[in-house]
Amino acid sequence: MNNPIQKWHDVVKLRDYNTLTEIIHDDAIFYSAVVYTPQKGKDITLKYLIAASEVFNSSSFKYDKEMIGENSASLEFSLTIDDTDINGIDLITWNNDGLITEFKVFIRPLQGVNLIHKMMQGMLESFKNVS
């Protein structure tokens, strides 16, 4: 089974959105920490992941722990935004071809969730204005 996690780390580190496009399945589902409904499809998943990459673009962002299975991984992260310490988990699932089929994000504490919600909303709105 192809494991896309190293490519994912490269995407995060280098903000390499071409590689991101290559590792997301056409029918991927993104589960946001701040949006109730699952976001279905490659295009919307890419928008959320790129927006998150821009919002989280901070020298303090890092993955602290990883648990990697046969076709899924749990990546614990931490960062600081506006003096708010935030941590969370990315749950990533992929298929036999190494394409990410599901991406779930969990964030804490509530102040961090609210801050990221506001920032993500602004970033996603800016994408709409560009399109």
Give the predicted meaning of each segment.
Residues 2-23:
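Short acidic-aromatic low-complexity motifs
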Residues 18, 25-69:
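A solvent-exposed, acidic/Ser-Thr-rich amphipathic alpha-helical stretch
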Residues 21-24, 28-30, 116, 120-124:
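Conserved short hydrophobic patches within well-ordered secondary structure
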Residues 53-131:
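A beta-strand edge to alpha-helix "cap/lid" segment located at domain peripheries
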